[in-house]
Amino acid sequence: MRRPSTASLTRTPSRASPTRMPSRASLKMTPFRASLTKMESTALLRTLPRASLMRTPTRASLMRTPPRASPTRKPPRASPRTPSRASPTRRLPRASPMGSPHRASPMRTPPRASPTGTPSTASPTGTPSSASPTGTPPRASPTGTPPRAWATRSPSTASLTRTPSRASLTRWPPRASPTRTPPRESPRMSHRASPTRTPPRASPTRRPPRASPTRTPPRESLRTSHRASPTRMPPRASPTRRPPRASPTGSPPRASPMTPPRASPRTPPRASPTTTPSRASLTRTPSWASPTTTPSRASLMKMESTVSITRTPPRASPTGTPSRASPTGTPSRASLTGSPSRASLTGTPSRASLIGTPSRASLIGTPSRASLTGTPPRASLTGTSSTASLTRTPSRASLTRTQSSSSLTRTPSMASLTRTPPRASLTRTPPRASLTRTPPRASLTRTPPRASLTRTPSMVSLKRSPSRASLTRTPSRASLTMTPSRASLTRTPSTASLTGTPPTASLTRTPPTASLTRSPPTASLTRTPSTASLTRMPSTASLTRKSNVNQQCPASTPSSEVIS
């Protein structure tokens, strides 16, 4: 039926579409639909597709076309390629989304072929955009059947790459949720993402970019690492938070964009999500969006974490939740607990943290948050400053080298600091991160920042004192204190973060929470080690680290230790 439909579709759409080719604009919505209408007989056979086609084209064309239209650049891009591949591909995506189930729809691409001349472009532009942008269909398509169809169709791959890249990215940049989405999907892709994320780890090399324009260089990095990355960069740079939702959906397309070329085949097997999370997320989020902040940071965290996980955790701590969460949450704790944890975090958990949305979510969620928060600079800064911070943070370094202090310092420091000494320490530590984020650059680098940290934190502390009290009240909160602190670290809104420890997640971003919620155990522990992990890990963290409570209680000691 598909083939007949396709054949018919091909004929009819081809005929009709070509006929309307002039009506390319019309074809986008009307002619194509008209074609569909003509195909109605055929379409009737595939009523669903037809409905989808008609419905989607209309909606997609209307909706997507304007967006695409808006992203004129995209359509043009598609246009150049569209006639040849893009067009077929475009249509394919369109067909895919519309008739994802109906590979025939992709097969129907023939009209695409005919329209390839023009209609396809118009339709694909309008629809594929819809398809890819729609994200779900594309993902469904790539993931469901289209992947096969797309995979089967090199153009499709190109289409995916090009269209999703452009279309998805078109939306993605706006959605630019790469950060969050990947995390979301990351959990699934964690492993795959890990590999992909590993590059982020390689990202350390990109750290410079991170250090520089956290977002831009990584974009370079992303661009370098990921073909589509460049395109994705905008997403990363773009609203990291908002799009995420769509990200998951769009990610596949987005990932598809990258993936198809990279692994059109992989896409089907991996499913766009995998591809997307891995590459898309990675690329997009890898924590590069933040990752630039995060991966770099994460890389730093991981790399540094690995290299100087102890140092890094602190730095990561300053860096932001992700690194700090990963390193601090676990790596530091891992350090505290032992390299294994850190190694795990660093090796996998870290990567998992980084990769498994947890950290990536953390990185993404937090980094994104951090990036959004302004961690990018801070991430860069943190990464660097953190390093500097590490350098300058003898206390932190001490904390770091104390490992116990390190974790405790960061956690106890925050937790302990949160507890009693934590006031100054807490002020120092979270604010440090907070400062790290803003003043901390220099402050972070400088030891004085502690004073500054203390100084600003004083305000923050005062602000967050309640939270701190709350934080202090609850070990988990203390853990969260780390998290809030981390969040605070991540975001100056220490007050908000600390004050609203949950808000830390919320403040941090829903993703962290979502991530937490999403992969609370894994993501949470891995990614949110800071937030959830610390919150949840307190158990683990408690176990791993001297129990946040212990931490907290002993935290006094660690604090003293740290403080000392």
Swiss-Prot record:
Residues 1-564 are annotated as: Disordered. This is Uncharacterized protein DKFZp434B061. Residues 79-97, 114-134, 170-179, 272-299, 378-416 have a biased composition (Low complexity). One of its GO terms (cellular component) is extracellular space. It comes from Homo sapiens (Human). Residues 250-271 have a biased composition (Pro residues). It comes from the Eukaryota. Residues 1-17, 153-168, 318-351, 467-564 have a biased composition (Polar residues).
